C-alpha cells in the first residue's frame, strides 16, 4: 500500500487507529465520500495473531522479520529493534528517509503555518505515521459500556485528522488498524473463563485471550501456533 506511492515519488500519510474494526472503517469510508473533493475506497485486511496492540503496531512497520523477545512482557522486536513508542520512527527511517511518527492529539493541536505547523510537517517528510487511540482505550477494563460512544468520537476525530492533513496539502492518506474489537456491553463472568491453565517450558505472557511462551503443551482448550506458522521469527509461541 505504501511502497507503490513512494515509488512514484509520492508522499504517504498513515493513520493507525487502535482497534478500528472493519465495520467502523466502512462507516468512515461513507463519511469521507460525502465530502467535496474527497475519494475513498476500503479493503479488508487480516490482523496478525495474536491480535493485540503491540504486535499489530509492529506488523504495520516495514520489516524483514518480527519476533518476540524472551522477556516477561514478550516485547516485539522488528529487525532487532524494540518496536515500542519512539523506536517506531527509527525503524521507519531505516527503510524510508524523512519519516516521522506522531500522536493524533499532537497533530490536531498544531497550527497550519509556521516552522512547527502541519504544512511544514507534510513538506519535510515522505512518510508520516499518525497514532490514534480512542476505541481501544474505551474497551479496556471497566469502560466497556463506553465503546459505542467511543466509536462515534473516533469517526469525528478521524475526519478532523484527515481534514488537517489535506489542508496542509497531503493527498495520499491510509487509515488502518492494528486489530479490531469484539463488542460486549457487560463484564465477562468468572464462569465464562477456561477452567484450565496453559502449560509449557516457559510462560512469558498470559493474556485474557492468548498465551505466549516456549514449547507450550498441546491442550484441547487451546489452539496452538508456532512462530513460523504466524510469519514470525524465533521459537517463542
Regions found by a protein language model. Give the residues of each.
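Feature captures the catalytic ectodomains and active-site-proximal regions of enzymes
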Residues: 1-237
Amino acid at each position: 500500500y505504501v511502497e507503490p506511492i513512494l515509488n512514484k515519488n509520492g508522499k504517504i500519510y498513515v493513520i493507525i487507529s487502535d482497534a478500528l474494526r472493519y465495520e467502523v472503517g466502512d462507516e468512515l469510508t461513507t463519511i469521507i465520500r460525502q465530502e467535496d473533493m474527497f475519494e475513498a475506497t476500503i479493503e479488508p485486511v487480516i490482523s496478525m495473531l495474536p491480535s493485540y496492540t503491540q504486535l499489530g503496531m509492529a506488523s504495520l512497520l516495514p520489516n524483514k522479520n518480527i519476533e518476540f523477545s524472551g522477556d516477561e512482557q514478550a516485547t516485539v522486536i522488528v529487525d532487532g529493534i524494540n518496536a515500542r513508542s519512539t523506536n517506531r520512527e527509527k525503524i521507519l527511517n531505516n527503510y524510508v528517509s524523512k519519516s516521522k511518527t506522531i500522536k493524533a492529539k499532537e497533530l490536531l493541536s498544531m497550527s497550519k503555518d509556521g516552522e512547527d505547523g502541519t504544512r511544514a510537517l507534510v513538506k519535510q517528510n515522505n512518510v508520516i505515521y499518525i497514532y490514534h487511540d480512542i476505541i481501544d482505550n474505551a474497551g479496556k477494563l471497566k469502560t466497556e459500556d463506553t465503546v459505542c460512544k467511543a466509536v462515534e468520537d473516533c469517526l469525528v476525530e478521524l475526519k478532523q485528522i484527515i481534514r488537517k492533513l489535506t489542508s496542509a496539502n497531503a493527498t495520499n492518506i491510509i487509515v488502518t488498524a492494528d486489530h479490531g474489537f469484539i463488542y460486549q456491553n457487560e463484564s465477562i463472568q468468572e464462569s465464562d473463563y477456561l477452567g484450565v491453565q496453559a502449560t509449557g517450558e516457559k510462560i512469558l505472557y498470559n493474556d485474557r485471550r492468548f498465551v505466549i511462551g516456549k514449547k507450550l503443551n498441546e491442550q484441547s482448550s487451546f489452539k496452538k501456533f508456532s512462530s513460523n506458522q504466524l510469519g514470525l521469527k524465533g521459537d517463542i509461541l
